[in-house]
Amino acid sequence: MSEFAPICIYLVISLLVSLIPLGVPFPFSSNTSTYPEKLSAYECGFDPFGDARSRFDIRFYLVSILFIILDPEVTFFFPWAVPLNKIDPFGSWSMMAFLLILTIGFLYEWKRGASDRE
Amino acid sequence: MIIDTTTTKVQAINSFSRLEFLKEVYETIWMLFPILILVLGITIGVLVIVWLEREISASIQQRIGPEYAGPLGILQALADGTKLLFKENLLPSRGDTYLFSIGPSIAVISILLGYLIIPFGSRLVLADLSIGVFLWIAVSSIAPIGLLMSGYGSNNKYSFLGGLRAAAQSISYEIPLTLCVLSISLLSNSSSTVDIVEAQSKYGFWGWNLWRQPIGFIVFIISSLAECERLPFDLPEAEEELVAGYQTEYSGIKFGLFYVASYLNLLISSLFVTVLYLGGWNLSIPYIFISEFFEINKIDGVFGTTIGIFITLAKTFLFLFIPITTRWTLPRLRMDQLLNLGWKFLLPISLGNLLLTTSSQLFSL
């Protein structure tokens, strides 16, 4: 427990370090006294049209789905990698089977074109 | 470092009073001290990187660079930061105020947390966790959420696209990076950063993980460049396409916080290259004065600690020349090229590297 105490304290301090600068310019912020064009979205000098939160490319979504599949699987490798010299061959080879399944899934996704951007 | 001094002081206190909670309070307060020193050091490190980048950029482009603020323009970054602190704080009228304000802070916090586990000397680490590098990987993947929040909160088309691009790029390159770190912890049989450095301490620089993991080293550099959004991969803030990406609507210190976050990220990836691949605080000269130099690393006093910090920082800042010079030599990739490089080149290569490392570890048992 004590080895995680520095993390908590450091978390509080880094919160302070990044939140205090946000508070400093408040005396100088003058949202009320400026003209409305200054606060509108920047679109190269034209009046902004439409809403920015419209449709976006589905491929960004695909990338995040692929990430969600692959990242936890990679995360599972860490508890196996550290004591590799202490576990028996069964343990190491069962992780190889896991890696094989991961690779097959990745190849399938590749052949289906989920990571194509055209 | 913390433990030694604390135990003696705590014994002294216990002789005065036997209250247990007083001891805990004292330990907590004593723990603040190294943390504050670390934060101060990080800030100075960021200022030095900004200065280095401006000077190197200037000399690559045959300019002079900053020269008026302080000797050789060292104080230029400090002057810029102070100016940004007193700038007007604009909040876009149609945007989401909370997401807009919190976004840069989240990016900074998540990157700052990674510095916990960097060993600067043989016992000079804030938290020597057994899950060390894993903490960095877990915490550093919070940063794209901050960028996404700021892109969404600005309600600007450029910002929105920039935020999406930043998130997609960070998560694409997260996996090759993790696989490279995984290969390192396979080699060292530990995820603790201190153990990883000590596994490289034999045979001088021939013991570096760089020689045992050349593929992993290159993949790590490329992925960490992409994680830092440095120039071959700076698509989220591509000036010619999206005005400044997710930073378009920002002004004042929030804009500055994004820059602090990006330089902090650059510094921490360089520190991790030093720790994981370049032997950390070890002097790394194999043949000359071998016994004397190895004894230096074992000295516990101020001298050994200072030398450890100096060696770590020297390796880090020498390595930093690579990302700074790539900024002025390589052209920017297209978005589909970027994602293809991540998913179809780096990921299979790092998987193969992991397989190679595993089999070499298994057969050498």
Curated annotation (Swiss-Prot), chain B:
GO terms for biological process: aerobic respiration; photosynthesis, light reaction. NDH shuttles electrons from NAD(P)H:plastoquinone, via FMN and iron-sulfur (Fe-S) centers, to quinones in the photosynthetic chain and possibly in a chloroplast respiratory chain. The immediate electron acceptor for the enzyme in this species is believed to be plastoquinone. Couples the redox reaction to proton translocation, and thus conserves the redox energy in a proton gradient. Keywords: Chloroplast, Membrane, NAD, NADP, Plastid, Plastoquinone, Quinone, Thylakoid, Translocase, Transmembrane, Transmembrane helix. It comes from Spinacia oleracea (Spinach). It is an enzyme of class 7 (translocase). It is found in: Plastid, Chloroplast thylakoid membrane. This is NAD(P)H-quinone oxidoreductase subunit 1, chloroplastic. One of its GO terms (cellular component) is chloroplast thylakoid membrane. The gene is ndhA.
